[in-house]
């Protein structure tokens, strides 16, 4: 009959399962430290402010260094004009030259 089965220790379980062999207060007893509540979770991070949406700039740019475009513009001033102006190459000339 269910619930009356005796386990190795002589105890009984309502489900008919064998009880552990350890007597009360032995190794199988619950650790009193486990009854303490779990540690609290860390507080949530602070809400985002407008400073969080600031665009990220390089540290050198914040110290007053020029940007890449400004640096290129300075060098373009010293180049001859034919180098800075785009050279127009007809597209069909290269395509027609390859056709047998």
Swiss-Prot record:
Provide the residue span(s) of the region labelled Disordered: 1-86
Q: Where is the composition biased (Pro residues)?
A: 35-48
Official protein name in the record: Uncharacterized protein DR4
* Native source species: Human herpesvirus 6A (strain Uganda-1102)
| Gene that this sequence comes from | DR4L
